[in-house]
Amino acid sequence: SDQLAAAIEGREIDLALVDASTALFLERYDRVLVEGAGGLMVPIRDDLFAIDYIESRRLPLVLVTNGRLGSINHTILSLEAVKARGIELKAVVYNRYFDKDSVIAADTHGFIERYISRHFPDCELIDIPVLN
């Protein structure tokens, strides 16, 4: 987690610096990605999760998922949290690298695609193929 990485370094995450850096990039570029890792409920600090940061800054979200066991549950829980917080969902990226079983992969992808089309009709589903 971000919190653990900061603790290991003996530092605290400076959100004002992150905000200032983001603003600087937004002045220079049309699109800026602020990347998190580990999910929406990863702690940045004891009192702040990634989803809190996204919500408070009104950042549009691109959610990344895959076909691993449990990913339907993880993805739907994340999407429900996004909806409850009123966060704008731009896209869901489906990473096919973890598609080890074609039947399970097709079912997982299909379920997520149907869910998004019903609950987030303006959201794009983007497939990332395996690159050899």
Model-derived regions: residue spans:
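Conserved catalytic-core segment of NTP-binding enzymes
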Residues: 36-120
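Phosphate-binding/switch loop-helix module in NTP-utilizing enzymes
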Residues: 2-44
